[in-house]
Regions:
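Early exported N-terminus immediately downstream of N-terminal targeting peptides
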Residues: 26-110
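Solvent-exposed loop/turn segments at secondary-structure junctions
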Residues: 83, 100-101, 146, 173-177
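Surface-exposed, charged secondary-structure patches
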Residues: 93-152, 204-218
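Short beta-strand edge/turn micro-motifs at domain boundaries
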Residues: 151-180
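Non-transmembrane domains of secretory- and envelope-associated proteins
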Residues: 174-218
Length: 218
């Protein structure tokens, strides 16, 4: 995966989905802008220790990520056609396992790319534009303009099932983040269904590949 794509995904998608300003009445552009600002402040403040304190990143993600993302909608998208035939218990388990996996992925990304994110925050520029809003769905474009790299557009997909906006997905250069997970899990989903993927994700976590325990940042 190109470094430009990874950096863009980390700066925009992670920081948007890992922060929460989803108060009632907050519009989609304001939500995304404030979320990115809050996320950049967090990384800038703790950049020197994030790589050595995975529990700090985990705590940040746990505090914000689960509140802003709709885990069921994300799980349905990743599961694709295999969601419809799965029993309720399998759906619940898959949703929980996938969410834990995403937390681990985002925690690792924020820790690994913290220096690059700080560099971007210091020298780059970010623009925000509402691309589409139709009833309870909206797309906000985050234009990342690094000083010495090509510009990257990240589209944040939101929906409003109730009184506040939630992040559904993010597209970097037209590529959906959740679609990457769906593609990766598709062979096992076809063979073993949601239960098989849940087994694999849980084994990965118990083997040490999952997110660490939470702890306050120093």
């Amino acid at each position: 995966m190109p470094r430009r794509w990874i950096l863009a995904a980390t700066v925009a998608a992670c920081l948007v989905t890992l922060t929460t300003r989803a108060a009632t009445g907050t519009g989609p552009v304001t939500l995304v802008r404030e979320a990115v600002d809050e996320g950049l402040v967090f990384v800038r403040t703790h950049a020197a220790t994030l790589a050595d304190e995975p529990a700090c990143t985990r705590a940040f993600i746990e505090r914000h990520y689960r509140e802003l993302l709709d885990p069921t909608l994300a799980a349905r998208f990743v599961a694709g056609p295999y969601w419809a035939d799965a029993p309720p218990g399998a759906r619940t388990r898959f949703t929980r396992a996938l969410t834990d996996h995403l937390v681990a992925v985002y925690a690792t990304a924020v820790s690994v790319f913290a220096p690059r994110i700080v560099e971007f925050a210091r020298t780059g520029d970010i623009g925000y534009r509402l691309i589409r809003q139709d009833g309870r769905r909206a797309v906000v474009r985050v234009a990342l303009r690094p000083q010495d790299r090509r510009d990257v557009d990240v589209d944040i997909l939101l929906h409003r099932p109730g009184e506040r906006w939630l992040v559904h997905d993010a597209r970097v250069a037209g590529i959906s983040l959740l679609a990457i997970f769906r593609q990766a899990f598709r062979p096992r989903l076809a063979r073993e269904g949601l239960a098989g993927v849940s087994d694999a994700l849980e084994r990965h976590r118990h083997a040490g590949g999952g997110p660490p325990e939470t702890a306050p940042c120093r």
